[in-house]
Structures are given as C-alpha cells and as structure tokens.
C-alpha cells in the first residue's frame, strides 16, 4: 500500500523548489527560511524519516504544500507546472543513468566536506551546488527554460541560487521516487494526492 503522506511531502519538496526558482527569477530573492530548507535537504542523505530531509518538521514545507495544492487544483502558474514536471522528468533520466548517479553521489559527498569551511548559503557553496547541477543534471535532458526578469537572470549569484534550488528539487524528486511516487498517480490519483496535501497543510496550524 502506498504511503501517500510521504509521497506528498516529497512532491511538495519538488514544488517548493519550483516556487523558489520562480521567486528568484522574478524578484531576485526568495523566502530565506524556505531557501535554507531547500539547501539543507542536499546534506541529509540518510534520513530516519522523510521529515528529516526538510528540517524535521512539516511546517518547513508550507510553501511547497501551498504550491502543490494550487497545482493539483489546476489553479497554478503554468511556468511553475513546467518547472516541477521538468524536475520529475530529469529525475527519471538520472535514475536510468548509473554513472550520473554515482558521480552525483560523489560530488554531494565532497560538498558536505566543504561545510567545515563555508556556510551552506555562502556564495562559495552556492557556486559548488550550481556546478553540480550544471555538470551532472542539466546534460541529462531538455534544459529547463527559466522565465523572469532578464536583469536578475543575468546576475551570477541569482543564476547560482536558481541552479542550487533546482538541485534541491532533484533531491526531492529522487525522494519522491523512493517513497513510491509515480507520474501515473499525478494523472489518475490527483484527488487522493490533493486530499492528502490539504490534510497535511491543515496540520501545520
């Protein structure tokens, strides 16, 4: 039997990354706590439970749950839809590429070693995360075309933040697959996913 609670949390993580990408591309900034939740998820590789990946509490996925609920209600922004579905598609490519998976694991291990020297949200760490995405994930499939302000999208720091958040989105997409998530569920069990997302969201308050 599928654990829809965990599937929805992982999918909310994907949607949260998509929303952060949109914020960064259109405003050059994102909610700081939610941004850190995304970055921190890259460092939690052996969680005891799914909540551990997102700071140990469901409330850290509030923005992602809101975004997922709007998306499942067909009320969401089309760019957001494209972003999170593209992340799921890239995860599918990654799962079929053993070399890419191994390289990704090695690069994440080296990333974790840099914590001794740099804060997770430092420009140096963001650059490392962005390079991991560009080197390993981006070549796997069709590049995600990000729409936003050209002035912001030209800034190297904004570019690195977006790629770092996309890498976090891949982390959530991998988790979604591990929890038993499938694209068929999004098509045929949308109401179940929506009801579960609403139930989890209501528990935050």
UniProtKB/Swiss-Prot annotation:
InterPro entries: HflD, HflD-like_sf. The keyword Ligase does not apply. It is found in: Cytoplasm; Cell inner membrane. It is a peripheral membrane protein. The keyword Transmembrane helix does not apply. Keywords: Cell inner membrane, Cell membrane, Cytoplasm, Membrane. One of its GO terms (cellular component) is cytoplasm. Belongs to the HflD family. NCBIfam families: PRK00218.1-2, PRK00218.1-4. This is High frequency lysogenization protein HflD homolog. It comes from Haemophilus influenzae (strain PittEE). The lineage of its organism: Bacteria, Pseudomonadati, Pseudomonadota, Gammaproteobacteria, Pasteurellales.
């Amino acid at each position: 039997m599928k654990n829809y609670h965990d599937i929805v949390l992982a999918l909310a993580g994907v949607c949260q990354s998509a929303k952060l990408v949109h914020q960064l591309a259109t405003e050059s900034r994102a909610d700081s706590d939610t941004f850190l939740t995304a970055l921190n998820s890259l460092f939690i590789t052996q969680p005891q439970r799914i909540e551990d990946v997102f700071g140990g509490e469901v409330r850290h996925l509030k923005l992602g749950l809101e975004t997922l609920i709007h998306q499942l209600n067909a009320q969401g922004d089309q760019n957001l839809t494209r972003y999170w579905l593209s992340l799921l598609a890239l995860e599918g490519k990654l799962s079929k590429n053993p070399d890419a998976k191994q390289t990704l694991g090695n690069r994440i291990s080296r990333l974790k070693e840099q914590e001794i020297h740099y804060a997770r949200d430092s420009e140096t760490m963001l650059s490392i995360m962005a390079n991991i995405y560009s080197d390993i994930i981006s070549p796997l499939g069709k590049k995600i075309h990000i729409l936003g302000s050209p002035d912001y999208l030209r800034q190297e720091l904004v570019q690195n933040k977006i790629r770092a958040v996309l890498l976090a989105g891949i982390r959530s997409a991998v988790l979604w697959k591990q929890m038993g998530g499938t694209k068929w569920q999004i098509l045929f069990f949308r109401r179940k996913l929506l009801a579960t997302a609403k139930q989890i969201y209501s528990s935050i308050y």
